[in-house]
């Protein structure tokens, strides 16, 4: 599948999963923003979601956690988006990962148990499944992460 088609499939899957959870989702016009979707969290504000496709590697889901290089180098999404909406095509699973939880070049979510039973500093995929995110948990991201985005009146 072409890169653009993969991105479109991920965006559609994340959009569908968010709408299924009765969340209001806005889709920005054009490709000029560093995020693909915006989720309204009333009355707090809005969360920006960057959609990514994950692949399986070494018992983990791996996704690109940097922006596309447009002559500026590959930059982190910190301050540009709030969440990664991560889609894993083989299982059609969607995960929501706060950008602050994936600040390296790649985001890693562990699917398989670690060989040494380590849990510290391991991000288990099950903890980020979209089904685990309540409206209160999403609102907590706004309160903890940054000032809420507000639409002009």
Language-model region placement:
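Mixed-charge (Asp/Glu-Lys/Arg
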Residues: 1-33, 38-153
């Amino acid at each position: 599948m072409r890169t653009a088609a993969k991105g479109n499939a991920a965006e559609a899957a994340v959009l569908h999963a968010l709408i299924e959870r009765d969340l209001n989702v806005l889709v920005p016009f054009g490709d000029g923003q560093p995020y693909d979707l915006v989720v309204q969290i009333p009355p707090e504000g809005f969360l920006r979601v960057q959609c990514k496709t994950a692949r399986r590697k070494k018992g983990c889901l791996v996704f690109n956690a940097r922006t596309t290089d447009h002559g500026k180098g590959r930059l982190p999404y910190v301050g540009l988006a709030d969440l990664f909406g991560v889609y894993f095509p083989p299982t059609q699973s969607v995960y929501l990962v706060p950008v602050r939880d994936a600040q390296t070049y790649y985001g890693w979510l562990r699917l398989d148990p670690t060989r040494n039973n380590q849990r510290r500093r391991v991000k288990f995929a099950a903890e980020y499944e979209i089904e685990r995110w309540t409206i209160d948990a999403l609102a907590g991201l706004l309160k903890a992460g940054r000032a809420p985005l507000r639409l002009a009146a």
